[in-house]
């Protein structure tokens, strides 16, 4: 019986060793551009430095997926002011290419919704309360050509998260990454990874 079990395992390992895979190129080839620009993601209905932190995580994932030079252009307001326009339309795309010398640029936003405080009773007898805050966080980004203003790629990702505490200012939640919030770091890193999936090569079984 034992010998039969060993033989079965050996056959399974042998079969696994025969499986072949092929590398599938990324759905979006960013290396077609000499240089790309990145506008700081705009934070919607939230205060703090969440926009800057989310932009940096997105930048890290893009450059990890494909080795392409990325120029950080600044906030949406600063970029639009620099080119004398008020929105990211075709004229803005052409102007950004001329002013910053990039062939395409990323622009998008990050939003936090469904912010709900939670209070958990640690133990029935201890009467110790722990306050947490649950929320949904979404990130949407598009890649725009500066040659003709066309949208070359767009995607969005949503994730639920929970942090220890969230401040409120003027009725809007305040997220501060400077507070070394590990939970928020993990949420931002995961959503940035999901959002940049099209830039990564994948492995497919033959």
Regions of interest found by a model, annotated:
Residues 10-13, 28, 97:
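Structural motif
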Residues 1-18:
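Sec-dependent bacterial lipoprotein signal peptides
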Residues 33-35, 40-114, 140-146, 150-154, ...:
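N-terminal segment of the mature soluble domain
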Residues 204-206:
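Short, solvent-exposed mixed-charge patches
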Residues 29-31, 101, 130-134:
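Short coil/turn motifs at beta-sheet boundaries
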